[in-house]
């Protein structure tokens, strides 16, 4: 069986963000930041024009997602112990065990994840990208979406979506 894919990485597929990771034993890193980079692979049937997708149509979608996270403090809103609250004055309070933080709402993104690991960030971005690709390209016969979030050189968390072969739409490849 033949498969086709496109790999997309641009220098602007990056975001700088603060976070702290919470470990299984309850300990946590100090608040710190990374300059994250995002890499995307999309595998699908070829269009009648011999393309998986046009790069120039995908790049703005990825850029919008990474830009939405840039220069924010990422808080894991679904962590079972961490608590957060937005005060009436627009300040977000975050409590984890004995730690207390307060920051302007505009600086904080409370994410629907249980930890701000690179794996969870890749999952969130990957799922958002998948939804946007489906909405923008309803005829896309997507087989696989791979999205990596690199927090430091050579160290990435990866989200991988693979379509169920029985449910995956197909397009006739270019002749």
Model feature map: region roles:
Residues 1-175:
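Charge-rich, low-complexity N-terminal segments
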